[in-house]
Structure formats: C-alpha cells, structure tokens
UniProtKB/Swiss-Prot annotation:
Keyword Acyltransferase in annotation: yes
UniProt source species: Herminiimonas arsenicoxydans
Record protein name field: Beta-ketoacyl-[acyl-carrier-protein] synthase III
Active site: C122, H255, N285
UniProt-listed Enzyme Commission number(s): 2.3.1.180
Subunit-structure text: Homodimer.
Function, as annotated: Catalyzes the condensation reaction of fatty acid synthesis by the addition to an acyl acceptor of two carbons from malonyl-ACP. Catalyzes the first condensation reaction which initiates fatty acid synthesis and may therefore play a role in governing the total rate of fatty acid production. Possesses both acetoacetyl-ACP synthase and acetyl transacylase activities. Its substrate specificity determines the biosynthesis of branched-chain and/or straight-chain of fatty acids.
Highest taxon of the lineage: Bacteria
Swiss-Prot/TrEMBL domain comment: The last Arg residue of the ACP-binding site is essential for the weak association between ACP/AcpP and FabH.
Length: 328
C-alpha cells in the first residue's frame, strides 16, 4: 500500500491589534520619518497588519491556530505524534527550549510526541510541510501538526520605513495525516547561502553582549529580483515531479511577501491572479505564518475545495526557497 500525507485541517490566528497604514504613518512621523498610504500600497499591496501584545509570544499565537486546525481535523491534541513549528521569532533567545516544545505543553499534549522547530524564515512553513510529508510517507508518524508562527514586530526597525511597513504577526497551522488517497503530490526545497546577506538578522550574542543590530535587514530590490525567478523555477520543478501542467493547478497559495512578487510569479507561470489566494493586503508579511494563514482563509471562505490542487511556495532568508503541490 502506498502511503500519502494529506491535509485534513487548517487553522489561523491574528492577534487583535490591527495596525493600518495610517497608524504607522503617524508613528513614524513622531521620529520625523515621512511615508504615505500610497507609497506603502503601491510598493507592497499592504494596507494593514496585526501586532501581538507585549505579553504574547509566538507559541501563544501558534496554539490558537493549532486548536482551530485540530478542531477542523476532528482530532484531539494527544492524537498528534509529531509537531513541526516554523519560526524565526522563537519564544526564547537562542531557540531553546524550542517553541514547538512550548506549544506541545500549552496544548496539553502528554503522549511524548516529537516536537521540533524549523528555521527557514519565510520559506519555513514550506520546509516544515515537506519534512512532515516525508515522516508520514516513511510510516514512522501518522498525525503531524505543522505550524508557522511569528512575532516579527519585535525585530523590525521602526526607523527604517522600507521594512517596518511590511511585516506583521500571526500564525497558521495544518494537520496532516497518513492517507491512501493522494494528498501531497510533490515537494522541492532549495537553499543558497551565498545570498545570506540580502535578508538577515545580522546581530549576534558574544559573552552576553549584543554585537551588531538587533533588527532584521533586507535589501528589498535584491530580494525582489531573485525571488520571482526562483519561485517560477521551483514551481515548475514540483509540477514536473507530479507530472502535471500549470493549468491543472486550481490555486496558488504563495508566501505573502509583496503583491508585486506574487503578480510576477503568476505571470511567469501563465496563471491569472484570480487563482492566487491573496491576504498580504490585510495581514502584511508574516514570514513563516503567511502561507498557512492564507491557506486557512481560502479553505474557510470556500474557495479551496476538496480534491483541488494547491501550490504553496515561498522564498526566505538564507537564502531559502521551496514549493509543495498538494491535493486537498
């Protein structure tokens, strides 16, 4: 019998603090930094994003999304035998205990299931999903909880208008299970460390002292130019692996980085933007959380239906990129 991994539940969570472009314009003005709604929207497509309260961590957001995904899957927390959590903003500096272990505790999972974090920034959820797929297909695990959760508002520099307007906080989750019916059809992951300096968190700790910046850095133009070509290439790679044509893809659920990157990707694939789930306008760029959040939106509003083919793809710091083609 051939084993497949199949998504049987999705969930997402946005912290309640919604921040509009006007809110940011007023905040930046206090430091003498000028921007406008037109400038932000024309370059990114973003009108609003959400920020977590100071006492909320990535694990808190992750737990809410996970509960919703488990509810849709009709599974209890103790039915999960592996948790994979993608984040670049873990609960603890240094990354341990892992945020996945914190989520395990907060969900009340007591079965001793494995729990691990994955760090590939905005590609993180794709990396986590592809990893879960391999564990399930090997027969070693049956029910896997895959989460992307971020509090990027903690690491953006509000004196840099080119980046601070882009990012937001949130979480998304899926439950995957072993199935005799095709679910995940193909996955492909890549990385190229030679581009590590165009999107990074350059600071490091030495002897308890921060060296360098505590904030993220992004060369937006370099990322934009690289991203469109890489996303087109990896999308075609998974289509080839699945022996499918782009016309057979019902929906693209991309990393919600920038509307221009998404438009460029759709154009290269010869697909209409009508086939793309877009949430960047209201969520901003939520890094590893963006794909599962957008997927959940598409599932819950009825656009993404059982049996349809969904392409999930993303690029992130490292430089990392990848794609997953799945039948819902």
């Amino acid at each position: 019998m051939t084993l497949y991994s199949k998504i049987i539940g999705t969930g997402s969570y946005l912290p309640p603090n919604r921040v509009t472009n006007q809110d940011l314009i007023e905040r930046l003005a206090l430091d003498g930094i000028e921007t406008s709604d037109e400038w932000i929207v024309s370059r990114s497509g973003i009108s609003a994003r959400h920020y977590a309260d100071a006492d909320m961590q990535s694990s808190d957001l992750a737990v809410e999304a996970a509960k919703r995904a488990l509810d849709m899957a009709k599974l209890a927390a103790n039915d999960i035998d592996l948790i994979i959590l993608a984040t670049s903003t873990p609960d603890f500096f240094g990354g341990f205990p892992s945020t996945a272990c914190v989520v395990q505790r907060k969900l009340g999972v007591t079965n001793g299931c494995a729990a691990v974090d994955v760090q590939a920034v905005c590609s993180g959820f794709v990396y986590a999903l592809a990893t879960a797929d391999k564990f399930i297909k090997s027969g070693s695990h049956k029910n896997v909880l895959v989460i992307g959760a971020e509090v990027f508002s903690r690491i953006i520099d509000f004196k840099d208008r080119t980046t601070c307007v882009l990012f937001g906080d949130g979480s998304g989750a899926v439950v995957m299970t072993a199935s005799e019916e095709p679910g995940v059809l193909a996955t492909k992951l890549h990385a190229d460390g030679s581009y590590g300096d165009i999107l990074c968190g350059p600071g490091r700790i030495s002897n308890g002292v921060l060296e360098g910046s505590a904030f993220m850095y992004m060369d937006g133009q370099a990322v934009f130019k690289l991203a469109i070509g890489l996303l087109d290439k990896v999308a075609n790679e998974v289509l080839q692996l699945a022996k499918m044509d782009a016309s057979e893809v019902d929906w693209i659920v991309p990393h919600q980085a920038n509307i221009r990157i998404m438009q460029g990707t759709a154009k290269k694939l010869g697909l209409s933007m009508d086939k793309m789930i877009v949430t960047v306008d209201q969520h901003g760029n939520t890094s590893a959380a963006s794909i599962p959040m957008a997927l959940d939106v598409g599932v819950r509003d009825g656009r993404i239906k059982p049996g349809q083919n969904v392409m999930m793809e993303g690029v992130g710091g490292g430089f990392t990129w990848g794609a997953v083609l799945a039948r819902m």
